[in-house]
Regions:
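Sec-dependent signal peptide recognition
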Residues: 1-8
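Short intrinsically disordered, low-complexity segments
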Residues: 9-11, 90
């Protein structure tokens, strides 16, 4: 019983450490997306969108669509990760991400919460 308790405690400790390091790739992706938008590099911003977020526009018009989406600028402040899903908050925006086999992708940006569980996003959604 003691060994099981120690093993469980060690696994919790390791999970806590992994959680903090697991936030960095999410924060980097969100930062790259926001920087691309701020600099007008809509092609790079579109490349960071998950397919379901790009579905907001015709396949050939992601760049035009995202240029007119008015996603608030900002820098990532808080990051929450739940397995393959993540949320990043800036001072004026909430972004949602999904971990794909190639890395983290933006699934929603320009999101404002309507209530505790529902978000409206100008790009994609949660």
């Amino acid at each position: 019983v003691i060994i099981k308790a120690l093993a469980f405690g060690l696994s919790l400790l390791l999970a806590g450490c992994a959680g903090a390091s697991g936030q960095e790739p999410v924060k980097v992706t969100a930062g790259r997306f926001l920087s691309a938008l701020a600099s007008g590099d809509h092609g790079s911003a579109c490349a960071l969108l998950a397919p379901r977020a790009r579905e907001s526009w015709a396949p050939a018009d992601c760049e035009g669509g995202i240029a007119g989406a008015n996603v608030p600028d900002g820098v990532p402040e808080t990051v929450s990760v739940w397995s393959e899903e993540a949320q990043v908050k800036t001072a004026r925006d909430t972004l949602f991400l999904h971990e794909s086999p190639t890395g983290w992708l933006i699934t929603g940006a320009g999101c404002r919460h309507r209530n505790e569980q529902v978000y409206d996003c100008v790009v994609g959604g949660p």
